[in-house]
């Protein structure tokens, strides 16, 4: 991994069965991490899927007849975890079968969540790493 400076580390794990969430943020002086990201096919260009957007930031669906809010499932502020416009994300569903670990297709159907997601902001050369265990 390219060399970055850790600028934030929050971890609430330690609850029942290790439940909790964590956020670690690294700042890079250049785009050396981007070069590594571009060689890994499991990193996807933003925007994220609707499911991942809901998990991290929450979404509101207004059909005209009803309003449904989903998420977020993390307790980080907009300052700690900003919405990134230009960048890449890497998702691992740690509860899924190994062949489905990079898919979020079934994640909203579960009573508990165990996932990791990395977000890289190309505008600020900042990497955000989030883990959620419920």
Can you say where each PLM-predicted feature lies in the sequence?
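Short, solvent-exposed aromatic-acidic interface loops
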Residues: 132-134
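Functional cores of ribonucleases/endoribonucleases
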Residues: 43-128
